[in-house]
Structure formats: structure tokens, C-alpha cells
Amino acid sequence: MSLRDEALEMHKRNQGKLEVKPNVEVTNKEELSLAYSPGVAEPCKDIYEDKRKVYDYTIKGNTVAVITDGTAVLGLGNIGPEASIPVMEGKAVLFKSFAGINGVPIALNTTDTEEIIKTVKLLEPNYGGINLEDISAPRCFEIEERLKKETNIPVFHDDQHGTAIVTMAGLVNALRVVNKDIAKIKVVLNGAGAAGIAIVKLLYAYGVRNMVMCDSRGAIFEGRSYGMNPTKDVVAKWTNKDKIEGSLEEVVKDADVFIGVSVANALSQDMVKSMADNPIIFAMANPNPEIIPDDAKAAGARVVGTGRSDYPNQINNVLAFPGIFRGALEVEATHINEEMKKAAVEAIADLIDSSELNEDYCIPGPFDKRVAPSVARNVAKAAMESGVARIEVDPQDVYDKTMKLTDLQ
């Protein structure tokens, strides 16, 4: 049976990948009186007096909405809300399997920025966090920024930040392998969409100053008159200080790091050969990378990562988002801020001991059960230290709870 046939059969047999199950039984009058009338009035009254108690008495404290408009779904593009639901269901399965979080898929029948923002704001009372998913750039930037300002729960566009966090964790370790200083490296990033912009911002936060971002028109620089948008304009102000113009082939020369979030075969072996010694290549285009790892290695690359599970160093968002939201929910965070993102980077990177670190093992595997608990612990701690936590908890308790909640063996 082909992958297509197997996938279709699995989805049809189960009528999707999710179901709703109660946490309590209702098998007699006493249980009915507690779950519904008259007993249900008691938590209602308590929540009315203190809205924070909604986290204690309802699913809000362990539930995240997975929201899309279906405009930028995986490698499929703008396929609309209905066709995006299987992906949102899949994301919800990962939330539950890796961190015990209830993920609720919501596919919106609008691509209007204001309507999306208004709808998500109206949903805020129900959810402990919002995971934005597969919303096209540059609209995704405004939607996330507005929602972060106008809501009081964590809003996280995983296509941006999940990718950036795992990429950064991999880069931290790859630089240890090649023994290069992050403040002195030259990075060329190909792809100026949601993931690329977020990666550049996180690289800057980690001290990388020599960066050139490319899109389909070549190097982005301040004052470029073509193919720009407000987000690219901002990035251009603090990247490519020398205003280098030209194609990817021209600007990748002497680079220490290539990061691709673009299209298959964008990077050639000759381009790799033109880079600095011991180059690091993260080729994350899906389903096919910018360069095949074996080809990159043959051209001189020292460390190669992709988005695929059939090659070493898989840069997979599942290493980040379950633990990030678990940590945020445990402290009832109001936001996911930069300190929490950095804490997630360090949690992922630190899981690989120096004695284990090598060219083919710079990033933990997606089924390493230590990942989500470690990320959750670090994120909860960072939330408390940075002032966005509503409650104080012991970070080690967060680790232990997440370890018990994960389905991984």
C-alpha cells in the first residue's frame, strides 16, 4: 500500500484523528448533579468572583487552540480552511502525545486580517493559549503582533518561532562541533517568509551581526526598491550592513552558515565549496531540502541538518512547541516572550552532552522523551523570572508532570 493510500485509509477509518472524551463519569443521579445542574453552579460562582479560577475548574488551563486560515499549509499552499483541518488535527495530536495538552483545531473561513484578529480575541476566554498555524506571510506577522498586544494569553505562531527555536538550538551545538564563535560567523539565510524572518530575529538576539537574507529576488538590503514589504524593510535595517547585492550564489561565498527555508535544490555543491571552511548547512525546505545532505557533505559541509526524519539532525518543530506551551500553561502565562524562547533553545541544545555531540548529532531526536519536560521546565522558569507568569511553581515539578503526561516511552 502506498503512503497516500495508507494515510487516506487511516484518516477515513477513524473519521479524523481526534475525539472528545469526558474526564468524569456520569452514570447515576449523583454524578449528574455534580457534572451538571445543580452542582455546576458552584464553579461558575467561584469563577465569576475570581476569573483566574477558570484555569483551575475548566479545560482552559490545559487547552490550546490551533488556529489557521488555510493560506500557507505545509508545502501545499493556499488550500482553504476545510483542506487544512487534517494538519490542524495532526498538530493537536502532537500537543497531546508530547505534552498532554488538549489541542483544538479551528479552521477559519476568512483570510481577512481584522476578522481573524477579532475572532481569536472572542475565543480568548476558552483557551490557555493560541497556536497560530499555516497563515501566509506577511499577514501572519501583523496577526500575531496584534494578538499579543490585544489578548492576555500566550499567542505563538509556530511556523515562525518553533522553527527558529529548533534551528537556533541546532546551530548552537553545530558551532560547538566546528569550534566557531557565534559573534564572528557570517550567516546567509535563504527564504524571507515566516520562518526565515523569525530565524533572523533570533540569530540577532544571540549576537549574530554578519547576516544576509535572500529571497527569490536575491539579497535583501536597506533601500532595495523591489520585492519588499514592511517586515523585510525592518529586517533590512539590521542585516546586510554592507548592502551586498546579488544572487544567493554570489552572497553565500565565505559564509560559515547557510540556513534554507526556501525551495528544493536552491543550494548547489559549487556554492557549498565557495563557503568558509567547515560550513554548517541547515537545508529545511520541505519535502525536499535545498541540497541533499550527502551532496553537501561531499562538497565540504561539516554539519548538515534538514527538516526530514530520514537524515541526521532533523530540525523539527515538535522539539519546541509542546514543551513551550506546557511550561506557559503551568504558570498561567500571559505571553510567550523572548526570554521564554531563549530558554527553550537552551533546553534543547543542552540535552546533548559534549561527549555525545558530533556532526550527525547536534539536535535531539523528536522521540527523545526528555525534550518536552526540559523545555517546559526552562520556559516556566523564564516566564516567572520575566514577569509574565500569573502563578509561581517549582520548575522541577513542571518537568516531572510533563514527563508523566508524555506518551513517549
Regions found by a protein language model. Name each.
Residues 158, 180, 283-393:
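Adenosine-phosphate binding glycine-rich loop
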Residues 150-164, 283-286:
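Short, acidic/small-residue loops that bind anionic groups at enzyme active sites
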Residues 131-134, 155, 257-311:
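ADP-ribose/adenylate-binding Rossmann-like module
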Residues 124, 182, 251-252, 272-275:
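A short, aliphatic-rich alpha-helical micro-motif
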Residues 69-71, 79, 108-109, 134-137, ...:
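Short, ordered loop/turn segments at secondary-structure junctions
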Residues 1-153, 382, 389-390, 407-409:
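N-terminal ligand-binding/catalytic initiation module
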Residues 74, 79-99, 157, 165-263:
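Glycine-rich phosphate/diphosphate-binding loop of Rossmann-like nucleotide-binding domains
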